[in-house]
From Swiss-Prot:
Classification via Pfam families: Mob_synth_C, Radical_SAM
Keyword Iron-sulfur recorded: yes
Family under the similarity heading: Belongs to the radical SAM superfamily. MoaA family.
HAMAP family: MoaA_B
Cofactor list: [4Fe-4S] cluster
Source organism, top-level taxon: Bacteria
Entry keyword Iron: yes
GO MF annotations in UniProt: 4 iron, 4 sulfur cluster binding; cyclic pyranopterin monophosphate synthase activity; GTP 3',8'-cyclase activity; GTP binding; metal ion binding; S-adenosyl-L-methionine binding
UniProt: [4Fe-4S] cluster 2 binding residues: 287, 290, 304
Name of this protein: GTP 3',8-cyclase
Subunit structure, interactors included: Monomer and homodimer.
Length: 360
């Protein structure tokens, strides 16, 4: 069996993090050198997952992060607290891997819900197991969910995820809706071969069920580094596939820093009206308005999904650092954020960590 290593990027230690932070503002918003303010925190709880989507993970053989390297519940309460006050984070999203595999998920959500000012709290999940936990998560303080679902065709789903769990995901969506975790959003990464067919049925399903579809261009974040730009099913391809079947109009509302370009769908003979979005991270990059900062399951700050460097907050935590030192390191990490991801540059290098070890 071939074992795929997670890969460890260049990590700034405590001394390096402090040096970078000296150039960053010492208070106020969490800024980078280009004037962008990070207000959206993505927190990965685990790198493990119970599906094996080909664009993210190999079928087998992926080395997991050792348990002692993962942040514990107390650390996962403290870091978001620092992020909200004094760093000004207003939205916290818990991700994985698959965050439902984290046994302390409800505890971590409840801690975030106690923060003041209270951030919006959301979850990105594959939906397997969500039906049983949606009500408890809502009670803990979760506001809404995004559920990953690339197709409603059972055979296509099994081929993409290497697991026959479509019914579980559909049940999870329904459970989230029943628990009031709305709007329920569906994240779809389309297969280059079947995606044009899948997206038509997926949008029809979402409109009928009252979910909001988000189609996300496949990015170079797979563990096997098999992504190819010339195989991309881009946003223009998605719209071309949908337009023969639906009446679409651009949403006139200001987009702001949101990653999705939204489209309104007029009611048709067989479908209600609604909206969907396309996140064109590759073909129409939105790096200039990015407002995200990322915390990996092992306590590293990443300023971008495609960063080649990380800043170690776990080391600071476990060395007994105070909140001010952690804040300074975080500010330094974000101050060094690049202008863009560079995917379309000839010298682009794919991150060593796959998406499962970063957090979406």
């Amino acid at each position: 069996m071939t074992v795929t290593a997670l890969g460890v990027p260049t990590v700034r230690g405590r001394s390096e993090g402090s040096a970078v932070a000296s150039d960053a503002p010492g208070d106020g918003p969490l800024l980078d050198r280009f004037g962008r303010s990070a207000t959206d925190l993505r927190v990965s709880l685990t790198d493990r997952c119970n599906l094996r989507c080909g664009y993210c993970m190999p079928a087998e053989g992926l080395n997991w992060l050792p348990g002692e390297q993962l942040l514990g519940p107390a650390e996962l309460a403290r870091l978001p607290r620092i992020a909200v006050t004094p760093l000004g984070i207003t939205s916290v999203r818990f991700t994985g891997g698959e965050p439902l595999l984290a046994r302390h998920l409800e505890e971590v959500v409840a801690a975030a819900a106690q923060l003041r000012p209270r951030p919006e709290i959301s979850l990105t999940t594959n939906g397997v197991g969500l039906a049983k936990r949606a009500a408890a998560l809502a009670e803990a303080g979760l506001d809404r969910v995004n559920v990953s679902l690339d197709t409603v065709d059972r055979a296509h789903f099994a081929a993409v995820t290497r697991r026959d769990r479509l019914t579980d995901v559909l049940d999870g969506l329904a459970g989230a809706r029943a628990a009031g975790l709305t709007p329920v959003k569906v994240n779809a990464v389309l297969d280059p071969e079947t995606g044009r067919q899948d997206v038509v049925e997926l949008l029809r399903f979402c409109l009928e069920q009252g979910y909001q579809l988000r189609v996300i261009e496949q990015m170079p974040l797979d563990a096997g580094h098999q992504w190819r730009r010339n195989a991309l099913l881009g946003s223009d391809d998605v719209l071309a596939a949908l337009q023969p079947h639906f009446r679409l109009r651009p949403d006139p509302a200001p987009r702001g820093s949101a990653p999705a370009e939204l489209w309104l769908v007029d009611a048709g003979p067989d479908t209600p009206a609604g909206k969907f979005g396309v996140i064109a991270s590759v073909s129409h990059a939105f790096c200039s308005t990015c407002d995200r900062t990322r915390l990996t399951a092992d306590g590293q700050v990443r300023s971008c999904l495609f960063s080649t460097e990380e800043t170690d907050l776990r080391g600071l935590l476990r060395a007994g650092a105070g909140d001010e030192a952690i804040e300074a390191a975080w500010r330094g990490a974000m101050w060094a954020k690049p202008a863009g991801h560079g995917i379309n540059n000839p010298d682009f290098l794919q991150p060593q960590r796959p998406m499962s070890a970063i957090g979406g």
